[in-house]
Design a protein with these regions (language model features):
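A small/polar (G/S/T-enriched), proline-flanked helix-loop surface module common
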Residues: 70-183
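Extracytoplasmic/secreted envelope proteins and their assembly/folding machinery
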Residues: 51, 55-61, 65, 134-141, ...
Length: 228
């Protein structure tokens, strides 16, 4: 069965065309909700932040250190991809096809290349009620990890997908999700890690090279939760 799914859900497939193959890190077992934010760290509470406020909380080159260059933001894409062989994504298809799954109106995003290569790390911030954020991102991760293997066709290019649930870092935020995605097209294979942390009314998603995601996740969450 085929289902049309918005690239909001599977936009990360573009990484296959940009990121060279990288080895997988050691992985955990099942993702679980994590306890509330670390002791002594600020939390977002119930305040819903504007997109402009979220933009100021994104990491920048100074936060990341030498070797990182922010990529220009591309215009929003409304193309869709075809998902083959994944019932979990089939069930999500109606919602995703309208762009509703991560269509939170208050959001900000930044993507960076590293050391002049195609290796990337990206950060997304969203703000809404805790319930909406939790249900929205939870539905996406459940669907994307609901099938160990499936295929997407993006821009006429067939891409083999393999997904693996990971245990999110403990002690970060109120809830956490993490997954490892392997993209295969022809002779090329790329591994991308994606970790999401919800803290109150704020949702952080860091995606990209597994090593870079692990390196910058804590820093991204600290800045996202910092009060001015």
């Amino acid at each position: 069965m085929r289902v049309r799914v918005a690239t909001t859900i599977l936009g990360i497939t573009a990484a296959l065309l940009a990121v060279p193959a990288c080895s997988t890190d050691s992985v955990g077992t099942e993702p679980t909700a994590t306890p509330s934010a670390r002791a002594g760290k600020p939390t977002s509470g119930t305040t819903v932040l504007s997109s402009a406020a979220l933009e100021t909380r994104l990491l920048d080159e100074n936060d990341l250190g030498s070797g990182y260059l922010r990529k220009p933001e591309r215009p929003a894409q409304h193309d869709d991809v075809t998902v083959i062989g994944c019932p979990a994504l089939n069930e999500l298809g109606g919602d995703a096809a309208t762009g509703g799954s991560l269509a939170f109106p208050r959001k900000a995003k930044a993507s960076f290349t590293y050391n002049g290569t195609a290796v990337e790390v990206s950060e997304e911030l969203y703000s809404d009620s805790a319930t909406k954020l939790s249900e929205g991102i939870g539905r996406i991760f459940e669907a994307m990890t609901g099938c160990p293997t499936y295929q997407v066709v993006a821009g006429g290019t067939p891409i083999g997908m393999a997904s693996q649930k990971l245990a999110p870092p403990r002690g970060l935020g109120d809830e956490g999700w993490s997954q490892l995605l392997t993209f295969s097209a022809g002779a090329r294979s790329t591994v991308v890690k994606q970790t999401a942390i919800r803290d109150g009314s704020l949702l952080l998603i860091v995606s990209g090279s597994p090593a870079l995601v692990d390196r910058h996740l804590d820093k991204a969450l600290d800045k996202a939760l910092a009060t001015s």
